[in-house]
Design a protein with these regions (language model features):
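Low-complexity or membrane-interfacial segments used for flexible interactions
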Residues: 1-61, 68-71, 84, 95-195
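Extended, low-complexity, charged alpha-helical tracts
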Residues: 77-79
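Conserved glycine-bearing catalytic or ligand-binding loops at nucleotide- and phosphate-handling centers
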Residues: 89
Length: 195
């Protein structure tokens, strides 16, 4: 019988973080499990790297990003009782001391192109600009003079330049950013702009 994911030692995550070049991931907005909503993420070799499995009936206020073997890497939780969309990201499945917070920009007084601001302890880390609905976003590092650290782009077929649609896209992560953080920000964008 075919297994959803074989038992193997996951070395993909380590090799992703140690890369000196940009990592190109293919993100498929579909869970590997039946009757689940989520994401399946592959590297350029076609190996499973990350996955997110949420049951259809469950609220999407608590999302767990897992590696290929199902170990939790990051927990993404919606902050309750906040103005606007605000998400807290924790290491593993803990609920203490968030690594960072991502908040939708809703200011009408400024002419910002930013969709989301990512901060840690009141220090802005990243700004996300572009259009998630068009799968054209850039994650800019505020600490490095707005240097692009990751990008979401439409994925096209190798032959004929045919686009796959909005459920399959590329996540290009520069070496300065952890791929799991870039994927967490992609999940948050999807939750904020899902309609």
């Amino acid at each position: 019988m075919t297994k959803v994911h074989p038992k193997f030692q996951n070395t993909c995550e380590k090799s992703l973080c140690d890369s000196k070049e940009a990592v190109v991931l293919t993100v498929w907005k579909k869970s590997l499990l039946f009757n689940c909503d989520g994401f399946t993420v592959y590297n350029s070799n076609g190996e499973l790297v990350f996955r997110v499995d949420n049951y259809m009936n469950c609220p999407k206020d608590n999302i767990v990003l897992m590696d290929a073997s199902g170990l939790p890497l990051l927990s993404i939780r919606r902050k309750k009782l906040s103005l606007g969309d605000c998400w807290m990201v924790y290491d593993g499945e803990t609920q203490r001391d968030p690594i960072f917070t991502a908040k939708k920009n809703v200011s009408i007084m400024t002419n910002k192109r930013s969709l989301v601001s990512v901060s840690s302890k009141k220090t802005v880390l990243y700004e996300i600009e572009g259009s998630y609905s068009q799968r054209s976003c850039k994650i800019l590092d505020e600490r490095r003079n707005k240097k692009k650290t990751a990008e979401i782009k439409k994925k096209e077929a190798m032959v004929g330049g045919v686009a796959f649609g909005k459920d399959v896209f590329k996540l290009i992560v520069e070496p300065e950013m952890e791929p799991r953080v870039a994927m967490a920000l992609t999940i948050i964008l999807d939750q904020i702009y899902r309609y």
